[in-house]
Amino acid sequence: MCGIFAVRLSQSKSVSAISEHTVNRALDAINHRGPDGKGIYISPDGTIALGHTRLATVGIATGAQPISSEDSRIHMIVNGEFYDFERIRSELQAKGYNFKTTGDSEIALHLYEEYGIDCLKHLRGEFALVVWDERKEQLFVARDRFGIKPIVYHLKDG
């Protein structure tokens, strides 16, 4: 069980950028969900923040998050477990995707690169994930079909 946290601020000039301090405070509040490490991503303009607290189960040495695409334009955080990830990983490697980790979460990133939001059709398991796609300027939030790993979100003024 990991903890994930994401914020997308409006492009309004009246809103100040997200600070690393703010993200770290949020992660401290959910640290009990993942005491084995934490990581953050903040977009250059400070309007997107992704945070992750990690409970290491698979890819213990190399599974830090957020994970990013090779071109650093797609960023993802995941709480969950993907079934049959070794087969999917092999298929993605055959298509030319390079893996930086040995964990199962990275398959979701490469499936998103390959299929976009249709990546969910290829994922089996219990999970909640958040993707920031700089190319599309899109924040994508999803969970497993049965809500085993629930996700809570809030929209304000939009």
Language-model regions, residue ranges each:
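N-terminus-centric sequence/structural signature that marks the extreme N-terminus
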Residues: M1-G158
